[in-house]
């Protein structure tokens, strides 16, 4: 089994893709948290997971943050 926070290249999203993605809830900017493999929307207070290099931009899949 792979550790939840590995440094495999496939665990991070394509930087070009990250430049154009916005939060689907607020349409605001996202910040990459490479250590957690998440895209953070500060305005929506949500963290979207990146799985196998693919950002999962579904609000129901996002983790709530404070």
Swiss-Prot record:
| Stored InterPro entries | Trm112-like (IPR005651)
Q: What SUPFAM superfamilies does this protein map onto?
A: Trm112p-like
The family database entries (Pfam families) matched by this protein are listed as: Trm112p
One annotated Gene Ontology cellular component of this protein: cytosol
Q: Which family does it belong to?
A: Belongs to the UPF0434 family.
Stored PANTHER family? PROTEIN PREY, MITOCHONDRIAL, ZGC:162634
The protein depicted here goes by the name UPF0434 protein Nwi_0075
Q: Which organism is it from?
A: Nitrobacter winogradskyi (strain ATCC 25391 / DSM 10237 / CIP 104748 / NCIMB 11846 / Nb-255)
